[in-house]
Amino acid sequence: MPLPLPFRAAAALAVGAVTALAAPAASAPAQDRSPATASAGAPAGAFTLSIPSAGIAGLRVMPYEGTTDDRPGTRIQDLGVAASPYGERGGVGPGRVGNLLITAHRLSAGGPLHDLPAADEGDTVLVTAGGVVYTYEIVATRTTSFRSARSLSEQRAAVPGAPGKAATQAMITISTCATPEDHAAGNHWSDAQGNPEHRIDKIGVLRKTSKASAPQGG
């Protein structure tokens, strides 16, 4: 069920906050012997996103060079899939140290992230790429404002919420619009791409990697 604004205080990071989100210091991501954390560089290709607690399973994610919710990214989202920007103004690939950015529509194009707000702290996020499953744990929710350059910098930072801080772990930001909440509050602002002012961001930390299961033969 969509969360009213303001979002849950225990999970939300206020717009403009500079707080870094860190996993417990002693817990490095557990790994099976075979898969390794991906090396630097552009993602090899499309991958999938699953968030069981939000009913999201096998959502196709298309990497592209750019930044969150720019025109190329919005065009990808309009296809009913998710977009993942990389490069100088984007994020990193699955399993890499830094911030894996994923955005998709909540209401239009089939609403693939319609129930993203239902995901809570402690819930599992599965990213499958190149035969490897990267398991992230949601650790926080934050609100991004498209009308605040600072807020956008915090969303896109290598360490979510802390622009300029060097990343030391693999993290993920999954973002979708807060259109219902904005409209309920009387806020009908939108940008050139039709994005409302606010977005709901779920932030996670990589906990383990494992081999993807081989498909069952029919």
What are these language model-derived features?
Residues Q31-A129, E137-G218:
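Solvent-exposed, non-transmembrane regions of membrane-associated and secreted proteins
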Residues M1-Q31:
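Secretory targeting and sorting signals
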